[in-house]
Amino acid sequence: PSSGTPGILLIALQKRGYEIGIFAGAPLNMPEFHKSIFAGISNLPIYPRGKGAVDSDAFAVEDFEKWQSSLKPGSRFFSFIFFDSVHAYSFPKESKYEVFKPYWGSINHMELNNSFDPAPYLARYKNSVRYADNLIQKVLDYLEEKHLLDETIVVISSDHGDEFNDNKLNFWGHGGNFTDAQIKVPLVIHWPGKKPANIEYMTSHLDLVPTLLPEVLGCENPTEDYSVGMSIWKEAGRRNWVYSKGWSRDAFVEPNRIVLINAAGALEFLDKTYRPSKDKTIPAYIPEVLKENSRYLK
């Protein structure tokens, strides 16, 4: 993760003269984003302004607006804005955000167990999401006010979901399993000139770069030269699974089951509720996927 090599998208943007602005409500050195995907970005703010996620996220929007306003008219720009308030279950104690009640006033993870009522915890989470939605709206309003929205691609997503014991196996938060509750996230793209559409087939974050590089930056290389994903708009030939990576093991998430693989190559077959699956068929695609991934992990 700390190879010092930036992501291919950032490299391509810089080569084409884009102004780069990174604004985060959380530190960029945990994980070491400053040494990986954002390596080489000048004036990269490692630490956020403000005390706590609520303040830091608000400052991220403020700093984005100041930065964008400082650019020369007509400048091409790429911005990455990361909000931490949802991750921290935080929101301002104001009536417009305290919509979901009753909510858990003070989180104590030691109280979580399989019989714990998730409703107040989930209500707090939803309130924090409402705050994040408000910040996103501020960004969109700014772009519209500056007459930039009609010529700017906006991608809204999340790095992971959060579970509230959805499958009654005492899993809470994220990073504990590969169920939809923890890995399925929203993806909303505002793309001027594109017709509105709902995509029903399986996609992943790995598909974003192969979507942007050819259409926005004019990349003519075959997708496999730089990514294991594929364009989000392409349905033909799409895999019927997505690859998800964890700290100690990875997963191939299929429509009706989850295939886990650890560092030693041992497989475990689970259903979508994280219980043993009756289907223990070894997927034919696994050897090819592992071989393909090794090209990017040398």
Language-model-detected regions and their locations in the chain:
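Histidine-centered active-site microenvironments of extracellular/periplasmic hydrolases
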Residues: 144, 148-192
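Structural scaffold positions in well-ordered secondary structure
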Residues: 13, 81, 136, 154, ...
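A short beta-strand-to-alpha-helix junction
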Residues: 2-7, 119-131, 177-183, 194-210, ...
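Active-site-proximal alpha/beta segments of enzymes that process anionic O-linked groups
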Residues: 1-109, 116, 229
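A long, amphipathic alpha-helix that forms part
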Residues: 61-71, 105-152
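Short catalytic/ligand-binding loop motif for oxyanion handling, primarily in non-cytosolic enzymes
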Residues: 28-35, 86-93, 162-166, 185, ...
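Short beta-strand segments
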Residues: 22-24, 78-85, 126, 153-158, ...
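Membrane-interface soluble catalytic domains
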Residues: 11, 28, 141-147, 191-298
